[in-house]
Amino acid sequence: MAEGGAGFSSSSTSSEEAVPWSTQQPMGWEELESLGDGGGSTSADEEFQWEAMFVKSRAGSPTAEDKSRTFTLPRGRPKNEPRPERGKGKTPKKPKKPDQGATLLVGEEPRPRLGSRTRSKSRSRDKHQLPDDIYDVPNPPMLAPVDSYGNPVEQVSSSESDFEDIANIRPILRRQQPVTVKHRREPSPEPLGHPTFVHRYDKPSYDEEVCQKKDKGGRTKSKNWLRQPGVKSKLTSMKDLSGSFKSLMHIRSDGEKHKQQQRPGGSGAPGGATPRDVFNTFLGSGTCPSFKNAFFLYLEGSMGVGKTTLIRHMREINGDNVISFVEPMFYWREVYSDCVKLIYSACKPFNLGKMSTSNKVLSAQMKFMTPMKCLQTSVRRYVKANEPLQEKTAMDNWLLFDRHPLSATLVFPYLSLKNGYLAFEHFLALAANFTAHEGDIIALLCMGEEDNLKMVKLRNRKGESGVTSAHLKDLGQAFHACYCTWLLLKYLSPEDMVSVCCCDVTLNDICIMRSMSSSKVTMAKSLFNKSMFPTLMDVIQPFRSNCTIIEICLTLFMELKKVEFIVVNASEFIGDIPGVWTSIYTQSLRTQAIKTQSIDWSGLRAFSLTYNS
């Protein structure tokens, strides 16, 4: 014990400043005396043993002098060490002791290294860090946030509101002295001058390009990415963005709207109604309704037979007693697609029997049907409710319609079916949409195919340049087949014809059951062969027992029986529009089954003006 203590004391008396406890040995250092001739020096291999000794020494009872000692790592340069002067060379490095850099002795302060670069505090603290039960290293103070100019800024509490953060920072910014900083873009690397990297806001306007061409010398900045973005370029980009949005939403621009206003029959035509005016007509005229009896006359027939010309003529000579509804050509050609062009392009000889062709024909016929069924529904709002059909007089008024839903749902699909452009299922889907009302009068204008072709060429309507006389002949036969179907339903009930089409009952059996004369039986057989019934029977033959098929046939026959037909040979009245009207007027008064309906005349007239505009 004495030798170990003497040896330790002798090695430490050379520098009493380094070993402050040389005069008095503290209690609890039994391990130091047991080492023998250690000389107080340590090596890298003994570092872990010294740490264990330091931890164990805390178990003893230190003296008052030990309590006053503080084992902290210095955070700066020692006060007694001179600072090296600039310009006089580098300070010579002191020789490194062999025991330096391993473990600090009690009371020894580590000497910082001098040089161009000083070790960071975190590395020094990690290297010389001692257990927590020896001493507590104080935490470094939190760095105060600063702004872009180096001024301290108060910490802003975390909040989800952007306005709250701005309100907390604003008082500090007001206390700062105003600093004027010229706004300019930082110079970018040369590769950013490539057009790929140039922002579209940096594109120069026309004036800037002219200035660049004039200023060729000097230190003019010609790079676009060095220029400050201008207001004009941003507004141009916003306009381009709005144009893209309009294109996405299919909104017409001002130029297209001007073209639409000049287009006849468009919703934006001069004198046309606004959407609010159109909707108000559906709600009523707002005045007391004035009911009048009127004929519901639908003009039907092939194209070019004079339907539109007759409506225009009657509206001019007798406008007070006539309300007309023109053909919805604008909806067919301008709304989303041109169904007239589609039907003519699909019905080509090389497209026979293709399902894709049938899909196109179905799509076109559905668009033909849509405005007619909508008009039919709209007009029924002005018919006096729960009012039976009225007996006609010579002074009754007239409602003239350009085509009935019959053509779009039955006649033209029947023609496409016969020619091989429409599938069976698509024909039944269109026929199931046919509807009619009691009191509907269909004036069928017939004309020979040669005369009809001349009329089509004369009017020169868009999309009808490829119409042939064979097509007009087939179309006339389709209308005649529909007329024969309706005429046969005048002799036999719809239930009887469903039995013939869907059941194993012949037409002869039905005539015998109804006790019909031989002349009527012959007439019924002739009408049956010319009607749509034979074709319909071939279509539904594989599925005659299906409930949906039976319901389609029954509804079709019942709806078709509601209308009344008037047939006019228009070939006899070519160029004689009053003659065509005289024939229609005379047959309407002579046919007992034709009756009139009571309608709100003033409200329906207002609606017709809106519809035709």
UniProtKB/Swiss-Prot annotation:
Region (Disordered): 1-233, 253-276
The entry's keywords: ATP-binding, DNA synthesis, Early protein, Kinase, Nucleotide-binding, Transferase
Catalytic activity field: thymidine + ATP = dTMP + ADP + H(+)
Binding site for ATP: G301, S302, M303, G304, V305, G306, K307, T308
Pfam family, one: Herpes_TK
Quaternary structure and partners: Homodimer.
Family named by the database record: Belongs to the herpesviridae thymidine kinase family.
Protein name: Thymidine kinase
Name of encoding gene: TK
